[in-house]
Amino acid sequence: MEQTETPSADQLETFPNPRPERDFTIEIVCPEFTSVCPKTGQPDFGTITFRYTPGESCVELKALKLYLQRYRNKGIFYEAVTNQILDDFVAACKPRRCEVTSRWTPRGGITTNVTCVHEA
């Protein structure tokens, strides 16, 4: 099922953190991320990794998957998409800490990794 909506924080669902009194780290790896290079129109393929310490809520994984699929046909640079994903994740989940890293497949012999961090 192809998603055509623009990605936004309200598409991310959450559930209550089962241990809000404890700091713990959740790592989510999404190895099939795609977007479109706004300069060339070619598809970009990458892996998005979330490492976060939840506050009162945790992200629901199916909603996260559907949110990320909405970037499939969106023209956006690596740096912009990584920052936007972090901003939307923080708005939806309100984590104590969150790090989003995008690792992109090589293009022209160059590999790019982008890491964005939020500290509450």
Regions found by a protein language model. Give the residues of each.
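N-terminal intrinsically disordered, cationic/polar leader segments
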Residues: 1-120
